[in-house]
């Protein structure tokens, strides 16, 4: 009797791949959903995945990569900076503006090989002090302090 039962229901008894696929899919979705929730809690307006600067020939060059984690599409991203020397003397302040659009969970990069910002030879440190996000709907969000998130 068992052999007969096995022969008739053999396919359903041995074919477990669909169940494993479903379980794997549900687990993947669950972990992805949890990751996105943690990411949005830590960086609700986005974060820098990379940035850097140089002052070759006293002219500031700058680049950054930003990922938008907000549902609103970014139209402009203004990155404000200050440059100091090794003892903290202020050498230059300014900002660079990147143009979108940058949709939710998209990242983009901007690069300025040259700029109209010049610094003295002892300029050695740059800090991003503020970011202003202008969204497609015209609203703005100012990011300072712990809202400035770097990967």
Q: Where in the sequence are the language-model features?
A:
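A structural signal for short, hydrophobic beta-strand segments that form beta-sheets
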Residues: 10-13, 48-50, 123-130
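Asparagine-centered strand-capping/turn motif at beta-strand->loop junctions
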Residues: 65-71
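Short acidic, flexible loop segments centered on an aromatic residue
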Residues: 71-88
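Short, solvent-exposed, Trp/other aromatic-anchored flexible loops in extracytoplasmic proteins
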Residues: 90-151
């Amino acid at each position: 009797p068992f052999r007969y039962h096995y022969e008739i229901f053999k396919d359903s008894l041995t074919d477990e791949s669909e169940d494993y696929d479903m379980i794997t899919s549900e687990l993947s979705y669950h972990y992805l959903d949890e990751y996105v929730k943690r990411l949005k809690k830590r960086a609700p307006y986005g974060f820098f995945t990379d940035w850097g600067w140089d002052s070759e020939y006293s002219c500031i060059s700058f680049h950054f990569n930003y990922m938008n984690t907000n549902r609103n599409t970014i139209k402009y991203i203004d990155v404000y900076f200050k440059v100091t020397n090794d003892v903290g003397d202020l050498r230059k302040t300014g900002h660079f503006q990147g143009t979108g659009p940058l949709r939710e969970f998209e990242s983009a990069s901007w690069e300025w090989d040259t700029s109209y910002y010049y610094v003295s030879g002892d300029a050695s440190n740059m800090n991003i002090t503020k970011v202003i996000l202008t969204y497609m709907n015209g609203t703005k969000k100012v990011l300072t302090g712990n809202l400035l998130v770097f990967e």
